Amino acid sequence: MLTTTCRRLSQALQRPHALSAVAQRCLRAPGARSYADQNEKAEQPRTFHPALLQFLVCPLSKKPLRYDASTNELINDELGIAYPIIDGVPNMIPQAARTTRQKEKQEETKQH
């Protein structure tokens, strides 16, 4: 049974495939773009719009966040964490956040 399945699979892979009618229509559609066209537009850096801050809150504390343009991060000063913004999209996953109070914690441990 396995050999029959393998044989059918190898025969199917060796045959030249004709595009379906739907695929042909999609390729000829006026909005269809090549991969090169998409790469040209993707090179432009996307920026974060600070107007989004009124809708975004920290997923851990549910408190508003502060945008830091120099580091391109959303900062929660209360918890001391910063969420990165990648291609204009905030990464609000808590595991992706970095701590901002690391230096303060190191100084406290040295004093004790």
From Swiss-Prot:
Pfam family, one: Trm112p
Gene Ontology CC: one annotated term: endoplasmic reticulum membrane
Keywords: Mitochondrion, Transit peptide
InterPro entries linked: Trm112-like
Compartment(s) of residence: Mitochondrion
Gene3D superfamilies in alphabetical order: 2.20.25.10
Residues annotated as transit peptide in the record: 1-34
Membrane among keywords: no
Major place of residence: mitochondrion
Family: Belongs to the PREY family.
PANTHER family: PROTEIN PREY, MITOCHONDRIAL, ZGC:162634
Name by which UniProt lists this protein: Protein preY, mitochondrial
Organism this protein belongs to: Rattus norvegicus
Gene this protein is translated from: Pyurf
